[in-house]
Amino acid sequence: GLDSKRVFKGADYNELGRLVGLEFRSNPTVGLEDGPLFQIGAGGDKYMSVLQMARVREVTLEKQFNDTWDHTLHWQQLKVLNKAYTDYKEAKNKLDFVDMIEKFILEGSSPKFDLLIIDEAQDLAPLQWRMVKEVLVPNSKETYYAGDDDQAIYTWMGVKLEDFLKASDKKIVLDKSYRVPSTVHSFSQDLIKKVSLRQLKAVSYTHLRAHETLMN
């Protein structure tokens, strides 16, 4: 396994910040599975977010910089950070979370699975999809992608909903929800029908009142 001493941590970000004249305030070790890997905070956090977003989206740094539309960021500073970050990790033999995914894909080996279930698959970014499709699926006898495109909220993080909707030719759409009361469902449909890219669903919902469901 990976030695924890090799993981890029807070002390490393502090030292990197001193080298490039930037401040990192957010928790930089948050993983993709925990939500936002890309923190919005001090200047250093925003620059680091651009670096990591480019890698997870698998686009060039310049494209990510242009797509970010943050006029408080400067291209030259981003390039300086990118080089310093890469050089620091190489000199100190450190890995960040994205490095771990890239290394896993490059090595191309995983345990053998009889059944692989990819939960919350609507939230996978392009790099994660490569990990799933190129490494995990070939080592699995059967694969299920579980998710709900109506709950896809991480497009800002590079997630492409098309990747989830096209993940499998065979789809099973559940026809009953015990989570959402009918009153909430009725209201939500007026909003979600404005979304053009989505899986159509014919779902029946519980007739419990909203406050009864929330109390359970």
Which residues make up each language-model segment?
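Accessory N-terminal region flanking or inserted into the helicase ATPase core
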Residues: G31-I117, P126-M131, T155
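A short, hydrophobic C-terminal helix/tail in secreted or cell-surface proteins
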Residues: A210-N216
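Generic structural signal for secondary-structure transition and capping sites
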Residues: F24, P28, S196-L197, T213
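Residues that form generic nucleotide/phosphate-binding pockets
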Residues: L16-E23, N27, G31, V50-A54, ...
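Conserved helicase motor core of SF1/SF2 NTP-dependent helicases
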Residues: L2, P111, L115, Q122-R209
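Conserved P-loop NTPase-based nucleic-acid remodeling module centered on helicase motor cores
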Residues: G1-K46
